[in-house]
């Protein structure tokens, strides 16, 4: 029997992710990343699953990798910032959240978390 392809693993992982089964979604998505480490869509989905599973440092690492390859990916910037916030690293979260809100000024949620990171970093 052939091993599943990166695409099949990605589809399985995203299906689990959409169903809210974050922990289970990490399993096929980690395998997909092993097969396709440069694929931003795989890394972004894995970051979402890790964030949902409250594995914030790993999520930040995945979103950081996406931002490295696609520095104007507003969603990856936003998720990187949110991951850093969940780790209590509000000062570090300010930059990616500010970039995300600049890239997508219509996103009220981006602005809200950007402002929250600024306030918490300034209070520290």
Regions found by a protein language model. Name each.
Residues 3-35, 52:
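Alpha-helical segment of the N-proximal tetratricopeptide repeat
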Residues 19-30, 53-65, 87-99, 121-124:
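Structural signature of tandem alpha-helical TPR/SEL1-like repeats
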């Amino acid at each position: 029997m052939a091993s599943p392809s990166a695409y099949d693993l990605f589809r399985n992982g995203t299906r689990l992710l959409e169903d809210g089964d974050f922990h289970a979604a990490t399993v096929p998505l980690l395998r997909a990343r092993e097969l396709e480490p440069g694929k931003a869509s795989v890394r972004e989905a894995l970051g979402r699953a890790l964030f949902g599973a409250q594995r914030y440092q790993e999520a930040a690492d995945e979103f950081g990798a996406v931002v490295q390859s696609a520095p104007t990916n507003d969603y990856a910037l936003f998720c990187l910032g949110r991951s850093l916030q969940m780790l209590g690293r509000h000062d570090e979260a300010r930059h990616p959240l500010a970039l995300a809100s600049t890239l997508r000024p219509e996103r009220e949620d981006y602005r809200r978390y950007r402002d929250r990171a600024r306030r918490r970093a300034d209070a520290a």
